[in-house]
Curated annotation (Swiss-Prot):
GO terms for biological process: cell division; proteolysis involved in protein catabolic process. Component of the ClpX-ClpP complex. Forms a hexameric ring that, in the presence of ATP, binds to fourteen ClpP subunits assembled into a disk-like structure with a central cavity, resembling the structure of eukaryotic proteasomes. This is ATP-dependent Clp protease ATP-binding subunit ClpX. ATP-dependent specificity component of the Clp protease. It directs the protease to specific substrates. Can perform chaperone functions in the absence of ClpP.
């Protein structure tokens, strides 16, 4: 091994790969008539790691032991509470999709079509989390796109091919990996056309975007600028085939239940008519009856609906489900805050009544599971601010009064209880 420090009388040595001298690098390792520096070794290690990761993804999607629908469902259960029917639908759809990719090279008379997925459910019901968990389970590139930021090509805003650009960025521009990834398009309901009749006016963020998404979802060669640059003439583009990318579209579809109810519960006229209350059925139950015609009436174009054949509906989360979400999943919020407080060598206790108060508040705000963190963060703000400078605190207790804003956390100083903020 040659050290970079040497006397002037010694012959100057150079790296055989990058050409740097022994004085420009930390170490120069000698072989038979060849030298390699520490920087080139690091670069080689990085290349090997990347290729091993790519091979691992390829193997995970082509191996015979692809997770079964039941195994996929079991893993989803660890992260997502409730939504049993939606998890079953997703497990089968994703299993069939990657099973189809395994058999692409086999010549057969029967060609298997791609089954993209549409998730319908209220805010905070777990749509995004389901898609994220699936991507993590399958170890494939994943990207979330917001449909409300998309516009038709030529207008100010993001065009649909930016979605593929983000997917490429997430896998270091490895095209083969990107072509087997998962794209989640959120707020798909926000780009519905304003009426169920085709408009004669330009709708740059509605029907026009749906038409542009249609090509991407069904499979096309997307042209993406290299390394995230903007498109301009005389530029080489990266070509990405979207045929085998799994697209999952999600949205709250507020008002869709009324469209379904109007179709399914036609009311009669006269004394013999059956009068049904539209409040008799839960919104989640109503959404299960969704048909393509309802989505068309809501404002999605028929062609796009046809490219999203798998429809899974998610129900509104009740108080019991929200309480479970707080404590049961692997990355449950309460477990996260326990860990944060443990870093300060303090035990955190959130009492069951406090969890119930958090769930009730989230229901009142109509934010679902998404609003749970902000409620807990607000309740713990003062104590998290003061705790790092406090001495001798061993435990913090949170009850329902803290969540409702009527009290402060109880601090345990060795054997003496004390209220936060009191002197």
């Amino acid at each position: 091994m040659a050290d970079k420090k040497g006397s002037n009388s010694e012959k100057l040595l150079y790296c055989s790969f990058c050409g740097k001298s022994q004085h420009e690098v930390k170490k120069l390792i000698a072989g038979p008539s060849v030298f390699i520096c520490d920087e080139c070794i690091d670069l080689c290690n990085e290349i090997i790691r990347d290729e091993a990761a790519a091979a691992g993804v390829e193997a995970s999607l082509s191996r015979s032991d692809l997770p079964s629908p039941q195994e996929i469902r079991d893993i989803l259960d660890q992260y997502v509470i409730g939504q049993e029917r939606a998890k079953k639908i997703l497990a089968v759809a994703v299993y069939n999709h990657y099973k189809r990719l395994k058999h692409l090279d086999k010549k057969d008379d029967v060609e298997l079509s791609k089954s993209n997925i549409l998730l319908i459910g209220p805010t905070g019901s777990g749509k995004t989390l389901l898609a994220q968990t699936l991507a993590r389970l399958l170890n494939v590139p994943f990207v979330i796109a917001d449909a409300t930021t998309l516009t038709e090509a030529g207008y100010v805003g993001e065009d649909v091919e930016n979605i593929i650009q983000k997917l490429l960025q997430n896998c270091n521009y490895e095209v083969d990996k990107a072509q087997r990834g998962i794209v989640y398009i959120d707020e798909i309901d926000k780009i519905s056309r304003k009426s169920d009749n085709p408009s004669i006016t330009r709708d740059v963020s509605g029907e026009g975007v749906q038409q542009a998404l249609l090509k991407l979802v069904e499979g096309t060669m997307a042209s993406v600028p290299p390394q995230g640059g903007r498109k301009h003439p005389n530029q080489d583009f990266i070509q990405v085939d979207t045929t085998n990318i799994l697209f999952i579209c999600g949205g709250a579809f507020d008002g869709l239940e009324k469209v379904i109810t109007d179709r399914t519960e036609k009311t009669g006229i006269g004394f013999g008519a059956t009068v049904k209350s539209k409040q008799d059925r839960d919104a989640g139950e109503v959404l299960r009856d969704v048909e393509p015609e309802d989505l068309i009436k809501f404002g999605l174009i028929p062609e796009l609906i046809g490219r999203l054949p798998v429809v899974a509906t998610l129900g509104k989360l009740d108080e019991a489900a929200l309480m479970k979400i707080l404590v049961e999943p692997k990355n449950a919020l309460v477990k996260q805050y326990h860990k944060l407080f443990a870093m300060e060598r303090v035990e955190l206790e959130i009492r069951p009544a406090a969890l119930q108060a958090v769930a009730r508040k989230a229901i009142r705000r109509k934010t679902g599971a998404r609003g749970l963190r902000s409620i807990i963060e607000q309740a713990l703000l003062d104590v998290m601010y003061e705790l790092p400078t406090m001495k001798g605190v061993s435990k913090v207790i949170i009850d329902e009064n803290v969540i409702d804003g009527d009290g402060k956390p109880l601090l345990i100083y060795e054997d003496t209880p004390k209220v936060a903020g009191s002197n």
